[in-house]
Amino acid sequence: MHILQVITGATLVSVPFVSAIPSSTSEFLPSTAEQNSAVLHSQGRSPPRLWTRLRDSIIETIWRVPSRQHNPSRIPSSLSIPRAPSSIRARYGDDVVLRFTIRSQNDVQALIEASNILFLDIWASTNEWVDIRLAKDVVSSLLGLLPSSLRTAHVPIIHDLAQAVYESYPQPVSSVPNPHHAFSPSVQQSSETQNIFFQDYQPLSVIIPWMRLLASMFSTHVRLVNLGTSYEGREIVGFRIGVRPANADLPTERRKAIVITGGSHAREWIGVSTVNYVAYSLITGYGKSRAITKLVEEFDWVLIPTMNPDGYVYTWETDRLWRKNRQENNLQFCPGVDLDRTWGYEWDGSDSRSNPCSEDFAGDGPFGGRESKVIAQWALNETNHHNVTFVGFLDLHSYSQQILYPYSYSCTNIPPTLENLEELAIGIAKAIRLTDHEHYDVSSACEGSVSSHKKRRGAALRSMQSAGGSALDWFYHDLHVRYAYQLKLRDKGGYGFLLPKKNIVPTGKEVYNAVLVFGQFLLGRGAQDIDWEGDFQFPAHSRPNVPEKEYRGPDEEYEISNQLEDDDNENDTLLGFRTQKV
């Protein structure tokens, strides 16, 4: 067992076995569940076959899933981090990140105009603050362009960006897995301290072989799909997790699918790790958890960790804070487009978005980004030719801890399913809060983040980062996905895009719990006969009571304001919202 750990650890570092990923597959996942006798169809558990036991033993040994019974541990390091080397200092100079407090739409507009003039990098914005990266010697120029109300309304949140960037890269590990650790019989009860893969951020050269290995070991319900190739020729790879139940109706029925994406913006590493965490939890939970087994039978889950593989590789090899993809533009020295501004619905190439040097350059036209175009083509092909109906979409970004629903391009056009979108978003926020007491705000993507109570008191400020051409709007409007969200993950600005690795597992747990709520909501009445409580990765003291009587049928009236009022009550039920059969 110890030898296997050493070999696997070396593999994760050197990745000597990288080979071409199997060519694109559009076939459905297995049409029945007969290949996997471990599937649970009752509260009891069938004894696993020899291969299942062997496979799970290997998986437990290599990548141990964090325990859902303990609070997320913060992995200590006995190594002191040295000063950033000259190469990083040369790239980031004396850059800092400032947070401006905004109080009116005039403040928002002033910051937008000043940032456009100086070509500044807006990191994040909410209804209350805006984070901007700039060089120290540009601060005075920025303040000179702002009204007096903003000249003193700012504080530095990152004083030394170069050092922060250096510290965000993986450092030498201070310990190795304990070979004498007593392995638990369940993958889902393992210790997070043994979870090699999720102890740190991983480069693409490690992620792809890891995905290939999981797909080969769990072939009964997992496949790799190649959605297309990036501008630089890398394959855009995703997991497809799903299997039709043995008692399913005709295989010609349309298969419902849910898409979870990350890495559209290259520097948002936490989104990539979180998609992988959720995928791993679904893969290893099938056949062990009734809830996960039900979700995998009812839906195909397509999880794409890196929508922007070229940009992601570039953040590891050259510029940690690169945002766009890597395709060439009219200006050779300003490559790349913002992929989340290039989707076809309400594409907007005006103002700074028409400047190739802008961080949110929208390209020369709708689907001007190579990666967004091939993913859209894949989705349309699945819908038109492979009998798939997409019913859910979660696009993971960072940072600012927000749950955003359509539309991004406009605050005046209201989505027709607004009440349902808000209702599910609030349930997701509650699941996240119960995980580790982190508060995620809920709002329309066109607005800044606004708490539920503030939203009811008056109109929210328009977000500095709202725009047309977003994946969120395209999936919701053009692909008719009824439940589409963008989740902006941790944190609220202490680290921004440079979130320390100790947050990987806690953030993964938060989104995994959110996905369970998401799937449960979409199951409708089919969720009633399952005990969901045991599958949430909550600390023991945060586990909610879920009495059956709290279920609200689809015909029952539900006042969203009641849910908003109850959202601050730590003891209220998680499932106290109306589920929807899709």
Swiss-Prot record:
Carbohydrate-modified residues: N381, N387, N571
Cofactor info, note text: Binds 1 zinc ion per subunit.
Pro-peptide positions on chain: 21-172
Location of the protein in the cell: Vacuole; Secreted
Disulfide partners: C334-C357
Single Gene Ontology BP annotation: cell wall organization
Stated role: Inactive carboxypeptidase that may play a role in cell wall organization and biogenesis.
Binding site for Zn(2+): H265, E268, H397
One annotated Gene Ontology cellular component of this protein: vacuole
Protein name: Inactive metallocarboxypeptidase ECM14
Record keywords, A-Z: Cell wall biogenesis/degradation, Disulfide bond, Glycoprotein, Metal-binding, Secreted, Signal, Vacuole, Zinc
Keyword match Glycoprotein: yes
Highest taxon listed in the record's lineage: Eukaryota
Biased composition (Acidic residues): 561-571
Range of residues in the leader sequence: 1-20
Primary localization class, coarse: other
Molecular-function GO terms, alphabetical: zinc ion binding
Listed cofactors: Zn(2+)
Alphabetical list of Pfam families matching this protein: Peptidase_M14
